[in-house]
Structures are given as C-alpha cells and as structure tokens.
C-alpha cells in the first residue's frame, strides 16, 4: 500500500478516455461538470519553445481547452507530456539527502593522522641491481610488537624468511616445493639452514615501514649463503644485518646431499660475488649440559602450527624456545642485540625438548659494551641429542637498568 501511494504521487492514475468523454457530454438536459484529478501534475503546452520550420520560427496558437455551454473552460486533453511527474521535486529531495550525509560525515571529523600506518601498498617485492638483489617492504603491525612496543626478534626473522621465499618466486626458481627449484623438486631436495647470524642495531616500532634486501652467494662447494640488510624505508637507517648458510637435504631420507649439477645450473646465475654482510663469528659455541647450565626449561613440545610444509619445525620457532630459558631480569632490562645459531638436527612434531642457558658478562674491554651480557644456549631432546647451539648478546634498554643488572649478578652468585 505504501509503495502504491508513493507511486501514485508521481504517476497519477488516469481514467479511461471513454469515461472522461462521457462526463463531458450532455446527459439529457443535465450538463456535466469538468472532471479534474486532484493528484495530477499538469504541464502547460505553450511553455515550450516555438518550433522552427526551414529556419523560420513558426507562430503557434496556444491550445485552449474546450468550452461548455456555460462558457467555462475545461482542462486540456490528457497527453503523455502533461502526465509526467515533477522531476524537480525528486531532484531536490535527492540533493537534500546528499547534503545531510555530507554534513554528518564532516561532523565525525575522521581524519587518519598517519596514512602509512593504515595503508599497506606492498606486494611481494621486486628484483633490483641487475636482477641479483630482491627488495621487499614490510609494515610493522600491532600484533608483531612485544612488551617493549618494538618488533620482536621472531617478527624480524619471519621477514627474513619471507623475503627468501619471495626472492625465489620472483626469480622464477620456485617449483612445486616450498622454496625449491624445479630440479630440486624432481630429486626430492629441500633447503635447510645450518647457521644463522643476526645483528640488530635498532628495533622498528609499530607503524614503521622496513625495507628488506636479500641476495645469495656461493658458500663452499655444496652450500649457499644468503644475506639480508634491513633498513628504514624512509630514512635509510640500517636496522638489522643477517647472514646464513644453507645446504640441501633429501626430503625422503632426511640426509644431507650435494648440489646436483642440474640444480647448480638453475641457481648460479643469481649468485652475487660479494662478501658477507657480517663478519663470521669465529668464536666457538659452547656445548652446555646439566652441570654448566644455570637455567633449564623442560617439557617443550612442538605444536601443529609450528611445522612448515616440509613437516619439520620452522627454524624461527627455535629462537622462541631458546629464549624460554633466558632469565626474566635480562628480558626486562636488556634487549637482544645479536645472536648466532648452529642448527644440528631437525625437530619433529613428536619431539620433547629442553632449553638450557648460562649467562656471562661481556668479555670485551670496549666501554661501549659496559653492562652487556652474553648468553650461551642449547636446545636438545630429552635423550640429550642436540638440536641447536646458540649464543646471544644483550644490551641495556636504558640507563635505569643498573638495578636489574645487580639483581642478575646476585642470582648468579
């Protein structure tokens, strides 16, 4: 009913011509009165511009309504033109609605202060420097920062891993496997990391955009070195440097393999002849045991979400397990500035692990390193088999960390 009423306001219902004519005729001696529809909207015909014939304006005589015997004029006959709705009323209503909506929007005053924090115009990156370097930007998300309001070390490591995979894809080397070339897929080979070295000069914060550059080089006869350089995309400040060594492993036998010539032919054109972005940490990693470890965390087990597509624990997860045994006072007053990891064997989903840590003062005489701590780490299975050996370096977060440093020293004593 409402729809009918609204429609009739713009498109009036007309009576049939027969009934209209019959009302205008004389019925015996009674003269009919003109019928006027109360809901109709009429348009004057003589309001239109006069027509032109052969370039000459032709005069027209306004159409007059018919007159009855009393001399009263009857309305002009109904046509399609004078039954059209008054569109000006409809346009005025639409304009009013838009103006009201615009006013309401202005009252909200929603204006983002930093567009770079809410806009993510990043794809999978691009190949630069003659096709040898891959570059990709990342925006630091709110769920990627920790208690210090800075990106966690796991976030940075995930960025390194993501750029490595995207580098292979952009170079056209990604086969059916995860990070494996077509020839590697044919031979059931995968890449595994054996050594990782990272130095963090400064951690990015929420909303920062970091640029990660990565490239690969040869490492001996059967290895590949991958380097990363992380910087602030706006200022160019170097934030993180990392280098790693990778070797091949047979996915079925889980044994290390030499690089086949077919695979070497695929990857060598992308090798960059350059020195490592970090000098190799030549200091030997110490093997801890129950007698030398100061902090032990037992009962660590992988979750299903910790496994990658190759059905072994993601190497980034190992870092989280190593830090499980780091003393809380160090985590509260210091930040991780460097780490060196040696991966000894893979870890499956049914493994049960132990994390061991021991703390030592910085053995350097450089005054810049005053207040720093070095930690030795071991991640092992319950049966004693080594998974990862590691060393981390921690620097004070701020000048007020001296109280926590005294607490750490007291606990060790």
Swiss-Prot record:
Family assignment from sequence similarity: Belongs to the acyl-ACP thioesterase family.
SUPFAM superfamilies: Thioesterase/thiol ester dehydrase-isomerase (SSF54637)
Key words of the record: Chloroplast, Fatty acid biosynthesis, Fatty acid metabolism, Hydrolase, Lipid biosynthesis, Lipid metabolism, Plastid, Transit peptide
Xref: CDD domains: 4HBT (cd00586)
Range of the transit peptide: 1-57
Keyword Chloroplast: yes
Organism: Gossypium hirsutum (Upland cotton)
Main subcellular localisation: plastid
Keyword match Hydrolase: yes
Gene, per the UniProt record: FATB1
One GO CC term on file: chloroplast
General function of this protein: Plays an essential role in chain termination during de novo fatty acid synthesis. High thioesterase activity for palmitoyl-ACP versus other acyl-ACPs.
Protein's name according to its UniProt entry: Palmitoyl-acyl carrier protein thioesterase, chloroplastic
Upper lineage: Eukaryota, Viridiplantae, Streptophyta, Embryophyta, Tracheophyta
Annotated segments matching region Disordered: 12-79, 394-413
Biased composition annotated in UniProt, kind: Low complexity: 29-40
Pfam families attached to this UniProt entry: Acyl-ACP_TE, Acyl-ACP_TE_C, Acyl-thio_N
Active site: 310, 312, 347
InterPro entries, per the entry: Acyl-ACP-thioesterase_N, Acyl-ACP_TE_C, Acyl-ACP_thioesterase_NHD, FATA/B, HotDog_dom_sf
Compartments in which it is found: Plastid, Chloroplast
């Amino acid at each position: 009913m409402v729809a009918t009423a609204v429609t009739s306001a713009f498109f009036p219902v007309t009576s049939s011509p027969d009934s209209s004519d019959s009302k205008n005729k004389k019925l015996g001696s009674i003269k009919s009165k003109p019928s006027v529809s109360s809901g109709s909207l009429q348009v004057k015909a003589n309001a239109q511009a006069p027509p032109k014939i052969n370039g000459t304006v032709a005069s027209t005589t306004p159409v007059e309504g018919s007159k009855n015997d009393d001399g009263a004029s009857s309305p002009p006959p109904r046509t399609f033109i004078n039954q059209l709705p008054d569109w000006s009323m409809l346009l005025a209503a639409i304009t009013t609605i838009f103006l009201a909506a615009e006013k309401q929007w202005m009252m909200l005053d929603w204006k983002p202060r930093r567009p770079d924090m809410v806009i993510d115009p990043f794809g999978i990156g691009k190949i630069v420097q003659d096709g040898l370097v891959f570059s990709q930007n990342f925006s630091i998300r709110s769920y990627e920062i920790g208690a210090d309001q800075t990106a966690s070390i796991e976030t940075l490591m995930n960025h390194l891993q993501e750029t490595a995979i995207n580098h292979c894809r952009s170079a056209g080397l990604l086969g059916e496997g995860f990070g494996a070339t077509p020839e590697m897929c044919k031979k059931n080979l995968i890449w595994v990391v054996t050594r990782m070295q990272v130095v963090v000069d400064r951690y990015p914060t929420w909303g920062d955009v970091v640029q990660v550059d990565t490239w690969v080089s040869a490492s001996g006869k059967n290895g590949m070195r991958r380097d990363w350089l992380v910087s602030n995309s706006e200022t160019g400040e170097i934030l993180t440097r990392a280098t790693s060594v990778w070797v091949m492993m047979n996915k079925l036998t889980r044994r290390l393999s030499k690089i086949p010539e077919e695979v070497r032919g695929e990857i060598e054109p992308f090798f960059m002849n350059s020195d490592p972005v970090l000098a190799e940490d030549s200091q030997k990693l110490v093997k801890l045991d129950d007698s030398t470890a100061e902090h032990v965390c037992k009962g660590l087990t992988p979750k299903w979400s910790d496994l990658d597509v190759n059905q072994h624990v993601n190497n980034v997860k190992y870092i989280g397990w190593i830090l499980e045994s780091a003393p809380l006072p160090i985590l509260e007053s210091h930040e991780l500035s460097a780490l060196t990891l040696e991966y000894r064997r893979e870890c499956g989903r049914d493994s049960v692990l132990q994390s061991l840590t021991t703390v030592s003062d910085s053995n350097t005489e450089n005054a810049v390193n005053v207040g720093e701590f070095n930690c030795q780490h071991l991640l092992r299975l319950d049966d004693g088999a080594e998974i990862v050996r590691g060393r981390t370096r921690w620097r004070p977060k701020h000048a007020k960390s001296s109280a926590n440093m005294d607490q750490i020293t007291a606990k060790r004593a």
